[in-house]
């Protein structure tokens, strides 16, 4: 019997030590009170002979709690028996140890343990409608930062494998920087961010952060360049090229939990994908695990999106300024709403006539449901109707308008280079005509990287490749100088940041190449004072946002912080996953002869119009251009259905139409460029 009791205690001590200790404390105190009460009742003095067991027990407890209660039992010390006095003193002393010490010690330990567990994040969170971020990379803090500009309060839970304190510090620094920059605008922090450290594949830990009640779940990939060790970096890069099984594992787990009948409806799962193998498996998971009405899985192809963006920025550098705002929650941005409208021409015409603030873009159909897309400063702007009709003006468009040849120098490389070239291919298919080549590209890179791309022989528009590393200053400068002189049109210099280097070397090569390009411009300016610096458009990609000020000091307007674009897109998709199809559309040019896809273009005012438009309001300009580009009298190949979104001045100042369009005065000049949404 004793052996079985001892075995049971041993098992319970291993499974639930805290409960066993508490039970032992209670039993010892109970035994002590019973024994003390029995002895005191036997030794009661004159006047307390009637003190029974329960009264003795009561006084025992009172003496333990307050030693002054000894007087209630002893009475007059002179007449009390020595034995009773000694017993009472023993009760007080032993009680202080057994009761006060043990119980207070236990409670102190329990509270301390509770606080530690809370800091470690091991207790369950009871939340709903929150955003969950699984894993951490260089884009994660930008996702949280962009949510600062949301109209609503947001609760975000981050679950990472390790480095909780580092993540918390990074979030705090990023938010503090933004709040300091936006102090004049009155931006307030409406975010509640909880960071937890644990196993992102654990069902229990995922349920502990109420993943089944979240509005959105964002699954991030890992950074290969986060290490400072070259050998570790090489191993990570080799793994990244093959695929990312961790993302797949996390997605399967999340899809299972969010697809359950008990989970919340319409949950959005945004998953970063960086390679074809992972993307193909994500597609299969969507086919087998996605439950309509429960969870919608949206794969974000990081390299393809960055490649398309960088190719578009090379072709039209001002697009960087445009997308920087439109892909953000700050200022004017893209919105989507379910609609019964099926005809996009009728939709645009109606909204341009009736609405005050929203700029209509398109209507898209998916699975029998229709969604309208518009540009505005707030979703509420969609429902602000005009109080009075807008006057109309007439504009004359250049019916023979065609984009000029694009001259591009690619300086350096990154992991998105093939996707950048695919972006050029897509652009050529839409804009090459009559045997004329729209693209004219020179690539300057190291010999190993050029060999890896087979010296760009698959791309007939690459007219020259130059072997040079970051130390070949003269060769780089001479190549740029000669290419600029050989072409009458502007030249875009796309400076890429190598993302296959260690964390300490990130952006170093890009900054060195930027210095070389600025030297070329400075020398030309000294030789020919009238040289137009705008003839060389510098587009610099950086990976680490902390290097922004360094690059900006070289008078560069088009700084592409590549990670921020993905972060901004992920943020918007986490709130409106229907924007995914729209983004796919504007980032992809049509094949030759097709005009179904619509993109955002930058077009020179002087070439786009036959005559300069008069000074007018934004509302008048948008309506006039749309009528002139979509009229029934136009031939099909002339009908572009163009919606003007804003314009860019020669000095780089950008205006995107937002708010009350009737109050925005537009005075276009010959050197201005229009921002427009069009099918060609």
Please state what every model-predicted region is.
Residues 1-680:
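Cytosolic regulatory regions of ion transport systems
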């Amino acid at each position: 019997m004793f052996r079985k009791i001892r075995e049971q205690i041993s098992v319970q001590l291993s499974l639930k030590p805290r409960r066993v200790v508490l039970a032992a404390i209670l039993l010892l105190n109970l035994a002590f009170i019973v024994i003390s009460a029995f002895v005191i009742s036997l030794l009661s003095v004159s006047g307390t002979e009637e003190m029974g067991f329960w009264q003795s027990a009561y006084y025992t407890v009172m003496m333990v709690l307050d030693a002054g209660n000894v007087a209630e039992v002893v009475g007059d010390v002179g007449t009390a028996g020595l034995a009773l006095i000694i017993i009472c003193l023993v009760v007080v002393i032993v009680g202080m140890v057994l009761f006060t010490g043990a119980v207070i010690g236990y409670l102190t330990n329990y509270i301390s343990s509770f606080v530690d567990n809370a800091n470690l994040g091991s207790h369950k969170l009871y939340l709903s409608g929150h955003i969950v971020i699984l894993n951490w990379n260089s884009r994660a803090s930008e996702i949280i930062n962009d949510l600062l500009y949301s109209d609503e309060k947001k609760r975000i839970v981050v679950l990472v494998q390790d480095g909780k304190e580092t993540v918390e510090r990074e979030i705090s620094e990023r938010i503090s920087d933004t709040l300091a920059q936006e102090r004049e605008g009155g931006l307030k922090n409406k975010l509640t961010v909880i960071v937890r450290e644990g196993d992102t594949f654990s069902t229990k830990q995922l349920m502990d952060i109420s993943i089944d009640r979240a509005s959105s779940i964002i699954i991030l990939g890992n950074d290969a360049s986060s290490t400072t060790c070259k050998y570790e970096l090489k191993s990570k890069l080799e793994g990244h090229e093959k695929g990312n099984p961790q993302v797949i594992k996390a997605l399967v787990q999340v899809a299972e939990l969010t697809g359950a009948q008990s989970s919340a409806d319409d949950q959005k799962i945004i998953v970063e994908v960086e390679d074809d193998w992972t993307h193909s498996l994500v597609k299969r998971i969507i086919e087998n695990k996605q439950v309509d009405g429960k969870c919608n899985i949206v794969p974000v192809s990081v390299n393809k999106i960055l490649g398309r963006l960088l190719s578009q920025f090379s072709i039209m550098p001002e697009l960087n300024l445009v997308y920087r705002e439109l892909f953000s929650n700050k200022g004017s941005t893209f919105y989507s709403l379910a609609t019964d409208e099926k005809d996009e021409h009728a939709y645009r015409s109606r909204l341009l006539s009736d609405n005050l603030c929203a700029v209509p873009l398109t209507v898209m159909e998916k699975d029998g449901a229709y969604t309208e897309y518009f540009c505005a400063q707030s979703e509420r702007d969609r429902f602000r109707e005009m109080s009075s009709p807008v006057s109309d003006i007439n504009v004359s468009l250049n019916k023979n308008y065609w984009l000029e040849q694009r001259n591009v120098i690619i300086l350096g490389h990154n992991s998105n280079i093939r996707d950048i070239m695919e972006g050029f291919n897509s652009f050529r298919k839409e804009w090459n005509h009559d045997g004329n080549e729209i693209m004219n590209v020179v690539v300057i890179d190291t010999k190993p990287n050029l060999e890896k791309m087979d010296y760009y022989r698959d791309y007939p528009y690459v007219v020259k490749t130059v072997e040079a590393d970051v130390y070949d200053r003269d060769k780089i400068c001479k190549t740029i100088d000669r290419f600029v002189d050989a072409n009458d049109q502007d030249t875009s210099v796309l400076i890429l940041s190598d993302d296959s280097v260690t964390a300490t070397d990130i952006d170093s090569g890009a900054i060195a190449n930027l210095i070389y390009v600025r030297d070329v411009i400075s020398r030309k300016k000294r030789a020919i004072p009238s040289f137009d610096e705008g003839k060389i458009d510098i587009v610099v990609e950086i990976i680490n946002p902390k290097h922004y000020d360094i690059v900006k000091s070289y008078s560069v307007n088009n700084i592409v912080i590549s990670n921020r674009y993905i972060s901004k897109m992920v943020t918007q998709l986490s709130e409106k996953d229907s924007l995914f199809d729209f983004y796919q559309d504007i980032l992809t040019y049509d094949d030759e002869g097709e005009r179904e896809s619509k993109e955002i273009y930058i077009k020179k005012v002087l070439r786009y119009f036959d005559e300069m438009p008069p000074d007018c309001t934004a509302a008048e300009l948008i309506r006039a251009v749309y009528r002139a580009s979509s009229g029934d009298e136009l031939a099909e190949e002339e009908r572009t259905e163009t919606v003007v979104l804003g314009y860019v001045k020669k000095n780089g100042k950008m205006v995107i139409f937002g708010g009350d369009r009737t109050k925005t005065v537009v005075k276009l000049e010959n050197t201005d460029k229009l921002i427009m949404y069009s099918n060609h």
